[in-house]
Amino acid sequence: ETGKPISGVKFELFDKNKESIGTYITDSNGEIHLDKMFLGDATYYIEETENEGYIVTKGLQTVKTKWGKITYVELENKPIQGKVQIHKTAADNNAITGHLKGDGLKDARFTVYDSDGEKVTVLRTDSKGFAESDWLRYGKYTMKETTSPLYFLLSDETISFEIKKDGEIVEIERENKSTTLQTHVEKSGYQETMGGSVIRYDLYHIQNKSLVPLENFYLHESLPADAAYITRLFTGTFNQNLNYTIYYKTNKTGSFKVLRDNLFTNKVYEIDCTKGLMAGEYITDIKYEFGTVDVGFCEVERPFIYCKTYQNLPNGYQFTNRVEVGGMYEMQKVKAEDSFTTKIYAPVVSRGKLPKTGY
């Protein structure tokens, strides 16, 4: 096929009576030299017996020698070639895509490497989950999944296979587990308070519980603008080294503005939320934006906020503040929410019975 010499090929030599004379092996140039062994005109036979990686030439080849002349015999071998076929299926039911367990998965990509670690080809599964290579030469190969089907987990397995026989197709079956997208957050605070009081809310179990990293990960705390406002924030710390930004929104604005940026997740910041505002303007919403967080992201020291309720809230009035944590994976949004309701109590002042006056 290439014209290159093949070393290590074994031949058996026979005399005219087809009695074995010996076994000979080609050198690095693909040649066997038999000097001064054969004199005169004669007939010999050679048979190729072993040729790793190539299709062995079958049958006896006739060689006729002549006195005083060099006889050349040249043989060509076709390489052993085969293919690899991968079938990728769902390991479980996928709530996002609707795939059922056993369904074929499209767009899984596999990179095939030879025994020296050199890239040979890239395979991509079709709508039924199948991908098949072109012809591969005899030898050992490995294959790695480099892109998983959408909303399925990428496998870290190195798949080994070998082409041994000409024309064979090595069939491989593999599964992908579904991507689980889940976040979590909880909050706690005062169940009752008085109007004009300062109260504290804690945020905890802030987690990326997905099996994949999430982009645009955020934490959003919101108070009802007619009941309370945020006065002070303690940021907490988190278990992954990231820089993040905190935004705020007030009772006077409908959009978020930067409160503090270039914050470090391993440091607690105390932030005064009353400075730089107009008269009668108060912060009602705080939003952390972390960018991309890895699997298992969570707080180490819990964040908490101090809030002040408005003075004139009536007895029995209830207000609910909410927290939301979320992110995105491959354009799929995920979020979790929690809330906490606080009730206002106001002491009832008993005036007593006024005495009668007059005549």
Which stretches of residues belong to each language-model region?
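Solvent-exposed loop/turn and edge beta-strand elements of beta-rich ligand-binding domains
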Residues: E1-Y359
